Amino acid sequence: MSKELMVSKIERGTVIDHIPAGRALAVLRVLGITGREGVRVALVMNVESKKLGRKDIVKIEGRELTPEEVNIISAVAPTATINIVRDYTVVRKFKVSPPEVVKGRFRCKNPTCITNAPREPVEPTFLLVRREPPLFVCTYCGRYHELGDLL
């Protein structure tokens, strides 16, 4: 295989590396990136990786992810590494970890939870109760959820 770059470097933005193979689209979904935002996104799937065997990579030009967005990625890509790029240089690099609080991103799986009532303006909120593997509890009904189950 050639050692050339498959996707060009980005001047400024975020590179999400070490995503398990086949999970890049799920990463975009949890970030709410649809392609209609006007942000340039590069997606590379199933490339060789010494660490994972195969991996996906997502590059988001012109946008640095918020800490909340970074940590919510752990729901679908727990091995992901985040690289913040400025002037074509990585200025920060870190691994994702489950957030302490997840608010308004997912629905509670309990059908009788008040957050699922059609006329109740209650935003679902989950608290982290265990890091490995991540386990959350709904603050309204007390139901436990693994992070991947919230998707």
Curated annotation (Swiss-Prot):
Q: Where does Zn(2+) bind?
A: 108, 113, 138, 141
Establish whether keyword Metal-binding is in the entry.
Answer: yes
Tree of life domain:
Archaea
Any binding details for the cofactor?
Answer: Binds 1 zinc ion per subunit.
Query: Membrane-crossing residues?
Result: none
Which one Pfam family would you cite for this protein? PyrI
Q: What do the Gene Ontology cellular component annotations say?
A: aspartate carbamoyltransferase complex
Q: Which GO terms describe its biological process?
A: 'de novo' pyrimidine nucleobase biosynthetic process; pyrimidine nucleotide biosynthetic process
For this UniProt entry, the molecular function terms from Gene Ontology, in alphabetical order, are: metal ion binding
Cofactor dependence: Zn(2+)
InterPro entries in alphabetical order: Asp_carbamoyltransf_reg_N, Asp_carbamoylTrfase_reg, Asp_carbamoyltrfase_reg_C, Asp_carbatrfase_reg_C_sf, Asp_carbatrfase_reg_N_sf
Q: Which UniProt keywords apply?
A: Metal-binding, Pyrimidine biosynthesis, Zinc
This protein's assembly is summarised as: Contains catalytic and regulatory chains.
Q: What does this protein do?
A: Involved in allosteric regulation of aspartate carbamoyltransferase.
Q: HAMAP family attached here?
A: Asp_carb_tr_reg (MF_00002)
Q: What is this protein called?
A: Aspartate carbamoyltransferase regulatory chain
What is the native source organism of this protein?
A: Pyrobaculum neutrophilum (strain DSM 2338 / JCM 9278 / NBRC 100436 / V24Sta) (Thermoproteus neutrophilus)
The lineage is: Archaea, Thermoproteota, Thermoprotei, Thermoproteales, Thermoproteaceae
- Gene that encodes it: pyrI
